[in-house]
């Protein structure tokens, strides 16, 4: 029997601080819960939305109940007895991190059980010897930044100086990352990508997970804005991924939508589709759900929840984006084929009500839909790898090294 899997990952959509959140400075974080609370109390109203958070299709898959199991609190405004059509769980992260790559790798069978390299100093973040090597190997004449920063704020602060000097803007965060912002037209997109490739080669031995190209446009601080031509240069996964097993054992198609291919360093990806906005990501995903052949795994990362709303601590914007996504989820559900398995999950938290601008260490929702799957609570997962192991079971692949299968279909003992 031919099968397809559709994975929709809402980047940063955590459902409550995990038991080790205090170790990460994230005690009290709850991305979903705090958004729902603000909405319920009319503190997230805008021209685009108002009132309680309305996510009927996510609720029908078990989102609210998953959050209830994780935190012992039902998100405000959610139904305690929704019309449940999905099976649901919640998962903690085995990897000792709260970044995009660790979360994604773990769910496909490669938890990060080593320490990433980090740039922990808030100012003068990058060691002089690294900066000297970058200057020497890339021939750039100088750089700006060299600090922890919000990507949108640093281009406001340094964008005009960048246009005067054409020095790239270097910055980082609490994640294992080196980010480079430059003007897409004046500095040049190809020049930015080439610079990032060189920097990635320099930093790879230090286990820096990603170098990210952050192009922007505009003429002054009032109208600088990042473009959709971001590019991630990531370390290759250290273990065989579910994707590779699917290709080797079943000759499957692995379809990346959004930044999935970059996150996995393009390992095990057979088709790639980029998209600029949340609407475009939904459109491309729906098109693949309608048209991808059998024996396919469709995987979309919905980055805007994280980049546009979580990091920017925009509660109303996050709520509005969730409500829009929920309307598009309805279309996905209506267009699933007879033997499709749908999975919704996240990779970490990024609570827009929380201090700072960084990710938050949280449980994630794990929501399944298949016509033969009994709607039920599937338990607490001790690793995001349970997602990949469940997919491997569904597709008839050999087991992954990590995780356990969560799926139990109607008629099974």
Swiss-Prot record:
<keyword id="KW-0413">Isomerase</keyword>
<comment type="pathway">
    <text>Carbohydrate degradation; 2-deoxy-D-ribose 1-phosphate degradation; D-glyceraldehyde 3-phosphate and acetaldehyde from 2-deoxy-alpha-D-ribose 1-phosphate: step 1/2.</text>
</comment>
<dbReference type="InterPro" id="IPR017850">
    <property type="entry name" value="Alkaline_phosphatase_core_sf"/>
</dbReference>
<dbReference type="GO" id="GO:0006015">
    <property type="term" value="P:5-phosphoribose 1-diphosphate biosynthetic process"/>
</dbReference>
<dbReference type="InterPro" id="IPR006124">
    <property type="entry name" value="Metalloenzyme"/>
</dbReference>
<dbReference type="GO" id="GO:0043094">
    <property type="term" value="P:metabolic compound salvage"/>
</dbReference>
<dbReference type="GO" id="GO:0009117">
    <property type="term" value="P:nucleotide metabolic process"/>
</dbReference>
<keyword id="KW-0963">Cytoplasm</keyword>
<dbReference type="InterPro" id="IPR024052">
    <property type="entry name" value="Phosphopentomutase_DeoB_cap_sf"/>
</dbReference>
<feature type="binding site">
    <location>
        <position position="311"/>
    </location>
    <ligand>
        <name>Mn(2+) 2</name>
    </ligand>
</feature>
<comment type="similarity">
    <text>Belongs to the phosphopentomutase family.</text>
</comment>
<comment type="function">
    <text>Isomerase that catalyzes the conversion of deoxy-ribose 1-phosphate (dRib-1-P) and ribose 1-phosphate (Rib-1-P) to deoxy-ribose 5-phosphate (dRib-5-P) and ribose 5-phosphate (Rib-5-P), respectively.</text>
</comment>
<dbReference type="Pfam" id="PF01676">
    <property type="entry name" value="Metalloenzyme"/>
</dbReference>
<keyword id="KW-0464">Manganese</keyword>
<dbReference type="GO" id="GO:0030145">
    <property type="term" value="F:manganese ion binding"/>
</dbReference>
<feature type="binding site">
    <location>
        <position position="359"/>
    </location>
    <ligand>
        <name>Mn(2+) 2</name>
    </ligand>
</feature>
<protein>
    <recommendedName>
        <fullName>Phosphopentomutase</fullName>
        <ecNumber>5.4.2.7</ecNumber>
    </recommendedName>
</protein>
<feature type="binding site">
    <location>
        <position position="348"/>
    </location>
    <ligand>
        <name>Mn(2+) 1</name>
    </ligand>
</feature>
<dbReference type="GO" id="GO:0000287">
    <property type="term" value="F:magnesium ion binding"/>
</dbReference>
<dbReference type="InterPro" id="IPR010045">
    <property type="entry name" value="DeoB"/>
</dbReference>
<feature type="binding site">
    <location>
        <position position="11"/>
    </location>
    <ligand>
        <name>Mn(2+) 1</name>
    </ligand>
</feature>
<feature type="binding site">
    <location>
        <position position="347"/>
    </location>
    <ligand>
        <name>Mn(2+) 1</name>
    </ligand>
</feature>
<dbReference type="GO" id="GO:0008973">
    <property type="term" value="F:phosphopentomutase activity"/>
</dbReference>
<dbReference type="GO" id="GO:0005829">
    <property type="term" value="C:cytosol"/>
</dbReference>
<keyword id="KW-0479">Metal-binding</keyword>
<feature type="binding site">
    <location>
        <position position="306"/>
    </location>
    <ligand>
        <name>Mn(2+) 2</name>
    </ligand>
</feature>
<dbReference type="GO" id="GO:0006018">
    <property type="term" value="P:2-deoxyribose 1-phosphate catabolic process"/>
</dbReference>
């Amino acid at each position: 029997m031919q099968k397809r899997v559709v994975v929709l990952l809402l980047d940063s959509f955590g459902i409550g601080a995990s038991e080790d959140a205090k170790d990460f400075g994230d005690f009290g974080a709850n991305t979903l819960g705090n958004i729902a609370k603000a909405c319920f109390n009319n503190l997230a109203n805008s021209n685009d939305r108002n009132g309680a958070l309305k996510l009927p299709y996510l609720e029908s898959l078990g989102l609210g109940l998953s959050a209830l199991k994780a935190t012992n609190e039902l998100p405000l405004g959610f139904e305690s007895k929704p019309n449940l059509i999905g099976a649901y769980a919640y998962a903690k992260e085995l990897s000792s991190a709260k970044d995009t790559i660790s979360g994604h790798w773990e769910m496909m069978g490669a938890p990060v059980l080593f320490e990433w390299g980090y740039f922990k100093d808030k100012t003068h973040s990058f060691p002089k010897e690294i900066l000297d090597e970058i200057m020497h190997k890339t021939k750039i004449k100088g750089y700006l930044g060299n600090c922890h920063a919000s990507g949108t704020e640093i281009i406001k602060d340094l964008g005009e100086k960048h246009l005067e000097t054409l020095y790239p803007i270097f910055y980082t965060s609490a994640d294992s990352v080196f980010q480079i912002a430059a003007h897409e037209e004046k500095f040049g997109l190809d020049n930015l990508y080439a610079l990032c490739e060189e920097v990635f080669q320099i930093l790879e031995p230090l286990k820096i997970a990603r170098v990210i190209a952050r192009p922007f446009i505009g003429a002054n601080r009032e109208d600088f804005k990042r473009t959709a031509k971001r590019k991630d240069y990531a370390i290759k996964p250290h273990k065989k991924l579910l994707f590779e097993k699917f290709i080797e054992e079943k000759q499957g198609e692995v379809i990346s939508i959004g930044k999935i291919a970059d996150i996995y360093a393009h390992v095990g990806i057979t088709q790639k589709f980029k998209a600029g906005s949340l609407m475009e990501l939904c459109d491309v995903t729906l098109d693949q759900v309608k048209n991808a052949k059998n024996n396919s795994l469709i995987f979309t990362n919905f980055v805007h929840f994280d980049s546009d709303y979580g990091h920017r601590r925009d509660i109303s914007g996050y709520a509005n984006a969730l409500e829009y996504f929920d309307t598009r989820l309805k279309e996905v559900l209506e267009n699933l084929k007879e033997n499709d398995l749908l999975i919704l999950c996240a990779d970490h938290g990024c609570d827009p009500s929380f201090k700072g601008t960084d990710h938050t260490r949280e449980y994630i929702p794990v929501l399944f839909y298949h016509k033969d799957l009994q709607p039920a609570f599937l338990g607490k997962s001790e690793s995001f790898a349970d997602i990949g192991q469940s997919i491997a079971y569904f597709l008839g692949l050999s087991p992954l090294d990590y995780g356990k299968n969560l799926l139990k279909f109607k008629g099974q003992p």
